[in-house]
Amino acid sequence: MTFGLIPIALAAQSFQLSRNEGEVKVTGTSTLHDWEEVAEQRNGSMAIDQSGELPSISSLSFTIEAESLKSGHDGMDKNTYKALNTNKYKEIVFKMGEVKSISPVVSTTNKYKVVASGNLTIAGKTNKVDLPFTLTVNDGKAILEGTKPLKMTDFGIEPPKALLGTIKTGDDIEVHYNTIWK
């Protein structure tokens, strides 16, 4: 029986999120202008079994250092950190619970549309979310890319304000991810 289990265990390939390639950014609007912040410090792991007709993702998790979100404007960054309560909550974390769907992209080999369900924790509040992405697996490398709309208030975050409330950030944000895993 032990021999039967070994190939199954070896079929899953582990991937680590590349910190130097790809990008994770958050975009939103305000009464003054649209804005974006890039996550400079992130890490994660993913396990994929490619032995079947479709790949099977057995685990996926990633973490963003909350104070690594950078807009290029110190004042905006400080407002973001205050809204995220980064003195208390240092990380933004996604941990997959299950893959809800996976299907091949017809025109491309090794490319799949995926919806993964899991827990997303921001500013200490955890919500179950569906994370849609396109997964490409080739030559020991995986590319995960997509966009997830969120509302700040769903995580107990009051959209930041500046200049005595005259500049207000919109509640709707989008997380854009184009990540490389090796």
Segments from the language model and where they lie:
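Low-complexity, acidic/polar, glycine-enriched regions of mature
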Residues: 12-182
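Bacterial Sec-dependent N-terminal signal peptides
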Residues: 1-16
